[in-house]
A protein has these predicted regions:
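Electropositive polyanion-binding surfaces
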Residues: 23, 177, 182-184, 200, ...
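Charge-lined substrate channels and their catalytic hotspots, especially those that engage the 3′ end
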Residues: 1-280, 287-333, 372
């Protein structure tokens, strides 16, 4: 809100007429005040009652928020101003014609009750403040001589009319995205225009394209970002080596999944004269190529992350970088940033050092092959004889680090992850649990150690940083979990959420018992989300 809007809003903490309000705002013109009131009313911040008295919406029992439809008829409204009372329940037929994502004004009624007996706010939509601009996905169907959209989600009306002039080339059976033109009233059906055609409904190609579109994920990069990426070439420039630690002769290698295409981290391990070892965690130095406020930086910021789905990836950076200069492929010079951790026989990190470097990976290893090497596979041990001893020492070090971490009260949920296998056409052919052997756990452990060392460094040197924090479990959620676990012989004290050892004891005892397979997942849902 601007200064006038804020001032008027504050004055309307008590009801008053517009004329009374003007007297408290000398120097503010009649039209300026009228415009201000219009803005505040349109946004749902203030309301006028039948006696023409204006007041903050909450004073008259109104709350503005976002309409969240469900597929079961009822809905919720997420208030603009968050509080500890949660979302507002909207019963069926009290939605006031609102659709998913609309900004609405809710008139609160008497509190209702949740299934567990706790109170919840209920209300009805009094006014639609602003329609959502979100597009709707669905399939084109023909009804006689007319065409309709059959939305993919039941959160929307079952049919939306598609005028022939607004089909956008779509044919019956196509998966499309539409933009609403008219929301309907009485017996008149809503109407929309097709803005994107993805292909035949039900095909893998159309389904994936629709999901990416719905979530604002764009595969193609802007021209300026592509030009910047192309100008970098495919080799590390000669002037980039200066001031970097040269690690090209050291035994550094990557370990990733079988289907991985970009390799952005690598590891190394070497003994020190003082009886300790130096663990090296090396990540691609992307910042050397993606400079602040450049086209690549702006596009990476907009995307936020790479998006992976079975058999494909939509990268945060163009493939020239993600699969090229910033991928630690074997035998090629690559710019990196290294964390060197000096670890003693007791598993304690005595020293951490960080440096920009240039590396040359000696091998592209997979979790599968490293696990086989650790199990003594003769053929692979012979093929990779130059790193077998190092891999075994790495695995032993990871076991030591994990034991020390567990002694500090860490939780090892070890929840299996499903993986979807696809064929060459991208069609799913199998679903299986992703294996998690010693190699997978080893890399997890090393990354945890590196991140902990970086966090410690930032904190010690008072550098501003964003920390990932896990708070203690909620005692009430822990109580529910304790009740579920009790029939299996587990005893948990919900009043001691900070005592993670009692939770790890449950996980240890449940491991390998098919009857208790759900316990790790239920415990995960009882924990506070990282923030």
């Amino acid at each position: 809100m601007d200064s006038l809007d804020q001032k008027v809003f504050e004055l309307l903490a008590r009801p008053q007429r517009q004329e009374e309000l003007r007297r408290q705002l000398p120097g503010v013109g009649k039209q300026a005040l009228a415009d201000c009131i219009q803005r505040l009313t349109a946004s749902g911040k203030i309301v006028k009652n039948k006696k023409n008295r204006l007041a903050q919406a909450a004073h008259y029992g109104y709350i503005a928020g976002t309409f969240l439809a469900t597929e079961r008829g009822f809905a919720f409204v997420a208030p603009d101003e968050k509080d500890d009372k949660g979302d507002i329940f909207i019963p069926p037929h009290a939605d006031g014609g609102a659709w998913q994502g609309d900004h609405v004004l809710v008139r609160l009624g008497e509190d209702g009750r949740r299934r567990d007996g706790t109170p919840r706010r209920e209300g009805e939509v009094a006014r639609i403040l602003e329609r959502s601009r979100a597009e709707i996905l669905g399939a084109v169907r023909q009804r006689g001589k007319s065409f309709v959209l059959e939305p993919s989600s039941k959160k929307y009306p079952s049919e939306i009319v598609l005028p022939k002039a607004h089909l956008g080339g779509a044919q019956p059976g196509d998966k499309v995205a539409v933009r609403m033109m008219y929301y309907g009233e009485g017996r008149v059906l809503p109407q929309a225009a097709v803005v994107q055609v993805f292909g035949k409904n039900g095909t893998m190609q159309a389904s994936i394209a629709a999901i990416l579109h719905e979530n604002g994920i764009q595969e193609a990069f802007p021209e300026d970002a592509q030009q910047q990426a192309g100008s970098l070439g495919d080799r590390v420039p000669a002037d980039a080596y200066a001031g970097r630690r040269d690690l090209r002769d050291e035994l550094i290698f990557t370990i990733d999944g079988d289907s991985a295409k970009d390799f952005d981290d690598a590891v190394s391990l070497k003994p020190l004269a003082n009886g300790r070892v130096q663990l090296g965690v090396h990540i691609a130095d992307v910042s050397h190529y993606v400079t602040p406020d450049s086209p690549l930086d702006a596009e990476a910021y907009r995307r936020g992350t790479s998006v992976y789905y079975p058999g494909h990836v939509v990268p945060m950076l163009p493939f020239a970088l993600s699969d090229g200069l910033c991928s630690l492929v074997p035998g090629e010079d690559r710019l990196a940033f290294a964390a060197f951790l000096e670890i003693g026989p007791d598993g304690r990190c005595h020293k951490a050092e960080f440096a920009k470097s240039v590396i040359r990976s000696k091998a592209r290893m997979t979790y599968n092959n490293v696990n086989k090497i650790l199990d003594g596979d003769a053929e692979l041990c012979k093929k990779y004889d130059f790193l077998v001893d190092t891999a075994r020492k790495m695995a032993d070090l990871a076991d030591l680090l994990r034991r020390r971490r567990m002694e500090r009260g860490a939780l090892d949920l070890d929840i299996p992850e499903a993986e979807i296998a696809v064929d060459e056409q991208g069609e799913p052919v199998d679903v299986f649990y992703r294996p998690r052997g010693r190699a997978e756990k080893m890399i997890e452990e090393f990354m945890l150690q590196a991140n902990e060392a970086v966090a410690q460094f930032m904190d010690t040197h008072n550098h501003p940083a964003v920390y990932r924090v896990h708070e203690n479990p909620d005692p009430e959620k822990l109580r529910v979990f304790a009740q579920f676990a009790r029939p299996f012989g587990h005893r948990i004290d919900p009043s001691k959420p900070q005592d993670t050892r009692q939770l790890q004891a449950v996980l240890d005892q449940a491991a390998g018992d098919p009857r208790q397979r759900a316990l790790p997942t239920l415990l995960l849902r009882s924990l506070a989300r990282a923030r």
